[in-house]
Amino acid sequence: MSLFHYIYKILFLVILFTISSTCFSETISIKGLVFSDLKINEVFANQKITSGYLTIENTNKKDEHLIHLVSNFSEKTELHNMTVENDIMKMKHVDKGITIKANSKLIFRPGSFHIMFIKLLKPLKVMNKYKVIFTFQNAG
């Protein structure tokens, strides 16, 4: 597969997250992927890390694979998952991405999959919208 063909198959999505104690009510639908319940946890004084949550529904007939995230307000943006090992909750970086099965939903929530925004570059204000770029492998 040529580099051009590979790049062509990757879909970049810009999703706006809102910081608040409730979820952002807007639903965004692009290429058979539906994004809803967007939220970034509130950031307190001098805090340099926070997490984000959302629901991604794949309405396509093919599985989709979320392979990369980037934001303009943190040095690193990573996918993480919480697991229990020997009765201890552990958070792990998911470096190979996440598959969203065809015609199913993946819910990012506390205690499960979530997005980590690491080394925040600026204070995040409540009710402001922030850009996060999602890169998918197929997008339908």
Task: List PLM regions with ranges.
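Bacterial N-terminal signal peptides that target proteins for export
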Residues: 2-11
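Compact, glycine-rich, soluble single-domain proteins
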Residues: 26-140
